[in-house]
Design a protein with these regions (language model features):
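A beta-strand signature from Gram-negative outer-membrane beta-barrel systems
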Residues: 40, 119, 133-185, 236
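Gram-negative outer-membrane beta-barrel transporters
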Residues: 539, 704-860
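Transmembrane beta-barrel wall of Gram-negative outer-membrane proteins
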Residues: 180, 197-445, 449-463, 467, ...
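Extracytoplasmic beta-strand/coil segments of soluble accessory domains associated
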Residues: 46, 77-123, 165
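Outer-membrane beta-barrel transmembrane domain signature of Gram-negative proteins
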Residues: 449, 479, 490-597, 800-834
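N-terminal periplasmic "start-of-domain" segments of outer-membrane beta-barrel proteins
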Residues: 37-70, 123-133, 185
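C-terminal beta-signal and adjacent terminal beta-strands/loops
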Residues: 708-709, 793, 850-860, 884-971
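Outer-membrane beta-barrel signature, preferentially recognizing the C-terminal barrel domain
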Residues: 569-581, 623, 627, 637-700, ...
Length: 971
């Protein structure tokens, strides 16, 4: 593969350059990082990463910044820790809060700490399929990366030590704590292709500015603060919309091939009104009107404060916190002009008995009155608005302002009106209406809604540390909250428009919020009991209260079927939910003999809604020689469902489908035979080797196995209507939808429900490898070499059987088909290897990182006969950064991620329409190519006209190469 070959050549070239350059400038090596005293994974004071019995990686600011090209902590960790997977993009609101995970498990199974204390969750629940589905974990992007001193990543189950959701591991973020000095940094970058490989109308540029400073707090304290501003533009990498470029004007939904023309373009039956191409050709981004696949646009402003004061050697206080505001916009699927159209009435010519022209309208349902002499009126929610004045005058339904068609006389059935400006809509054959009656069209060129979020997030912790009777105490209280106000812009409510001929274009959808209050007290005491080390006893208690709320949106957003793209949160789905839990733990750590470390921990938790649980952990390390050691862990874990998993409800609307997410703990879900959620349980094993065969060479190999039972996942869609191959159970789905108080779009070809449930059991197995070696080339510089790799497999075991009531409605119904299982097992590549060379010489520095990804297997559509395999081949991605210290305080860095501009493989091509016989059904899950205008290999994958050129949830940035520059001033 050319990209892999070129990547390896660059790595070799930079290594050679490091050997011919001229005295080395000392910097923190990976070996020195291993000697950093850690606070994660152990209660023993003074423990280093190199001596730890648990596998832990320490990443300083150099490791996080050099060669990553990002100021987002989530992306920085994703670039440097192979077992840490950072989501690249998502759909809908999932694109507004991207998630990350350890070892391919749910993001909910990774605990995030800041300065050793629990971080609150995001309120934004990822309900779309694919990577991170069901997660509402802590949002790492809201912590200013410029405020971070280092990060400790514990790759081991630690629920018994830190809390019952630390099944996969722990990410502990340690903030800077300086009392003097500071830095000012600015970053700017853009993609090679200015917004992906589909050509672009979206640029994808990014900007970042940060300022941090440490101040003395009287004579014995510090106050370190940071402010950061980030901006990212839209990018777009979807394919061409066949409805735009196909002369047959493929209508929405299930389409039937009726023949093939001489040019190879399929002739499709028309289910609904056709739209002339000349109306839509001027859309922004034509013909790639679907911009749902790509980066969101956002502005993020965040701040951080970390302060402490030592009153004496035995008593100190501390406080730290973060605050952030995000304004983000995510593109949605393009809608054709016929998506929001109102019929104005049947045509009745002027006559003595009908002086007002067509449909004088004794019923307000007619929606429009016209006069042979000119004026017409649009019906509003309060009745008709009579409009005196010029012929053709009317109301703009979005603004209420008077508009004019500019046409004297009556309106005929051959006419369409632009609802936003009152102008007649031209077509290739004149002002031809979509149907047999005059029609009011809200978006004559179609429209592309946006889901918008205005997020406010904050957390603060205050505490004290003191010594009493030989015990070291740490008492802390913390409170965090995340509030998301959600909007849908550039949209409209179809049924409201039909009923009233008026609709807002922008909607307030409502809000979702999550908060967490935590109070903890920890105490440790070393006891000398005659062994090789003191017995360190740690005890602690925690009280926590979590809340989750959904706030009602604009009633016009949820009126009947609701606004296009997202109908908001109705009153029936709003509410605030809470629970409390109380925990206590005890931890014993000792070295019975000099070569052996033992750590045993136990934890008891009580949940007000789930009762009690007891979990434990045993960790051991044995140093065979000073150079070689073995280590291992056995642990159990427990994760209660998040409140979002229990109570979230919303309707997801696409141009051709409407799906209701049922609250797991609701009467509607119970009607479908679903029971309330239960906690997940886990059992983990790990065994590793630690080696120091040379003075500066260190290596670790850790194998692991994590079994999770009652895993909480989102079900496949159970449909009330749909096409062959779907799970269809209308006798259950329609009553459940009605009980939930929701009206779905009657034009949707697929309508159904999903819900979270304890659906599967999984077994995750793999191995983590790290090798660190600094090489001093004398006059040619110092190179820190790091090799890090992860091999990970996921196997789905038990599947929850469908409830009897669902099987009675449809004997073939299942919550998890083979496609769903395949997605769980292959959502990330099995293999990832990072090779990093970090070189310094006097004022110069350079970093080369080669990331090798193994193959990934995926399908574009649901499990039906048109599944299109999309196997992504293994690939090598090269990152390169060069640095120069202009002065002792000023540094310039220039770099590129994905130097060779590699993109994921284009999805496998579908069969050409010309090869399909007349009468063939084109399902929404996978279709044929519609004509010669479609680029080679592009595949239309759903009835929305959306074309995925790369699978959703790709493992590296599908936008391709990214170049950047960074300037930093230290003082």
């Amino acid at each position: 593969m050319l990209n892999l070959k070129n990547s390896l050549l660059v790595g070799a070239s930079v290594s050679a350059f490091a050997m011919i350059a001229a005295p080395a400038l000392a910097q923190q090596t990976t070996a020195q990082q291993a000697e950093t005293v850690i606070v994660t994974g152990t209660r023993v004071q003074g423990m280093t990463a190199a001596d730890s019995a648990a596998p832990i990686q320490v990443l300083g600011t150099d490791a996080l910044q050099h060669g990553t090209g990002s100021t987002d902590l989530r992306q920085q960790l994703g670039s440097t820790v192979p077992s840490f997977t950072a989501q690249q993009f998502g759909n809908d609101t999932a694109n507004l809060t991207l998630s990350a995970s350890l070892r391919g498990l749910s993001p909910n199974d990774t605990l995030v700490l800041v300065n050793g204390h629990r971080r609150h969750y995001s309120a934004n629940l990822h309900v779309d399929g694919g990577f991170g589905s069901g997660s509402s974990s802590a949002d790492l992007s809201l912590i200013p990366s410029a405020a971070i001193d280092h990060v400790e990543v514990l790759l081991d189950g630690a629920a018994a030590q830190y809390g019952t959701d630390a099944i996969a591991g722990v990410v502990n973020i340690i903030l800077k704590n300086k009392s003097s000095g500071g830095s000012l940094s600015a970053n700017v970058g853009d993609y090679y292709d200015r917004g992906g490989f589909s050509g672009g109308n979206a640029k994808g540029e990014k900007y970042d500015v940060s300022y941090g400073m440490g101040l003395p707090l009287f004579d014995k304290g510090f106050a370190d603060f940071t402010v950061q501003k980030q901006y990212q533009n839209f990018s777009q990498f979807g394919g061409a919309d066949e409805r735009m470029v196909n002369a047959a004007n493929q209508p929405v939904g299930q389409n039937t091939v009726t023949g093939v023309g001489s040019n190879g373009v399929a002739t499709l039956s028309t289910l609904g009104n056709g739209i002339p191409n000349n109306l839509v050709g001027g859309t922004i981004g034509y013909p790639r009107d679907n911009a749902i696949d790509g980066n969101l646009e956002y502005q993020l402003t965040s701040g951080e404060l970390n302060a402490g004061y030592d009153f004496s050697d035995n008593f100190s206080i501390y406080a730290f916190g973060t605050i952030g505001h995000k304004f983000g916009k995510s593109m949605e699927n393009y809608r054709l002009p016929n998506q929001i159209v109102a019929t104005m009435g049947s045509n009745q010519p002027c006559s003595a008995s009908n002086p007002d022209g067509y449909n004088t309208g004794s019923s307000t349902a007619d929606g429009l009155k016209a006069s042979c002499n000119g004026p017409f009126a649009l019906r509003t929610a309060s009745g008709f608005s009579a409009l005196p004045g010029t012929p053709g005058a009317g109301l703009n339904p979005a603004t209420g302002q008077v508009i004019s068609t500019g046409q004297a006389g009556n309106l005929f059935s051959s006419q369409m009106i632009n609802a936003q400006n009152g102008q007649l809509i031209p077509s290739a054959t004149g002002e031809t209406a979509l149907g047999t009656s005059p029609e009011l069209v809200l978006y004559p060129k179609g429209f592309r809604p946006m889901e918008v979020i205005k997020e406010d997030d904050y957390q603060y912790n205050i505490g004290e540390k003191f010594n009493l009777a030989g015990w070291a105490f740490d008492a802390d209280v913390g409170y965090g909250k995340d509030i998301n106000n959600v909007y849908t812009w550039n949209s409209g409510n179809r049924t409201l428009f039909i009923d009233t001929h008026a609709t807002p274009l922008n909607f307030y959808d409502g809000s979702f919020s999550a908060s967490q209050f935590t109070g903890t007290i920890d105490a440790t005491h070393p006891f000398n009991i005659g062994m090789a080390s003191p017995l360190t006893v740690a005890i602690g208690a925690e009280a926590r209260e979590d809340t989750y709320g959904i706030g009602e949106g604009d009633p016009l957003a949820s009126y009947k079927e609701g606004a296009q793209s997202f109908p908001g949160f109705p009153a029936s789905g709003s509410g605030v939910h809470s629970r409390k839990n109380y925990a206590g733990y005890i931890d014993f750590a000792v070295a019975p003999i000099e070569q052996l470390q033992l750590d045993v921990a136990g934890r008891v938790e009580h949940y007000t809604d789930f009762g009690d649980t007891e979990i434990g952990k045993v960790t051991a390390r044995y140093d065979i020689t000073p150079q070689y050691a073995i280590r291992g862990t056995v642990s159990t874990g427990f994760r209660a469902p998040t409140l979002a998993e229990e109570f979230y409800t919303a309707v997801n609307v696409s141009p051709t489908s409407a799906t209701l997410q049922l609250p797991a703990d609701s009467a509607a879900a119970n009607l479908m035979g679903l029971s309330n959620l239960k906690p997940e349980s886990s059992t983990s094993y790990s065994l590793g080797i630690v080696a120091h065969p040379l003075d500066d060479l260190s290596a670790t190999v850790d194998v692991y196995s994590i079994a999770i039972g009652n895993r909480i996942v989102n079900s496949a869609t159970v449909n009330a209507t749909g096409s062959a191959g779907d799970i269809i159970a209308p006798s259950i789905v329609f009553p459940a939808i009605a009980l939930a108080g929701v009206t779905l779009d009657p034009t949707a070809t697929s309508a159904g429900v999903t819900a979270f449930l304890n659906g599967i059991s999984t077994l995750t197995q793999g191995v983590d490898v790290t090798v660190n070696y600094p090489t001093d080339f004398g006059d040619y510089g110092l190179v820190n070499w790091t090799l890090a790799g992860n091999y990970n497999t996921i196997h789905v075991g038990r599947l929850a059987p469908p409830p009897a009531v669902l099987l009675a409605s449809n004997p073939n119904a299942t919550f998890f088909d083979s496609f769903s299982v395949f997605g769980f097992e292959h959502q990330t590549p099995n293999i990832r290897v990072n090779l990093t060379a970090d070189w310094t010489l006097d004022e110069w520095g350079a970093t080369v990182r080669e990331t090798l990804w193994g193959p990934r297997h995926a399908y574009t559509g649901p499990n039906n006969s048109e599944n299109i395999p999309n196997d992504q081949a293994g690939v090598g991605i090269t990152d390169l950064e060069g640095r120069y210290n202009i002065t002792d305080q000023l540094q310039l860095a220039i770099g590129a991620n994905n130097v060779f501009n590699i993109h994921p493989d284009i999805n496998g091509a579908a069969p050409d329409c010309a090869n399909l016989p007349a009468g063939t059904i084109i399902k929404a899950g996978g279709s044929c190519k519609q004509g010669p205008n479609q680029a080679n290999g592009e595949v239309q994958t759903n009835g929305n006209g959306q074309v995925y050129q790369t699978p959703i949830g790709g493992f590296f940035d599908p936008n391709g190469g990214y170049y950047y520059a960074r300037v930093t001033y230290n003082f």
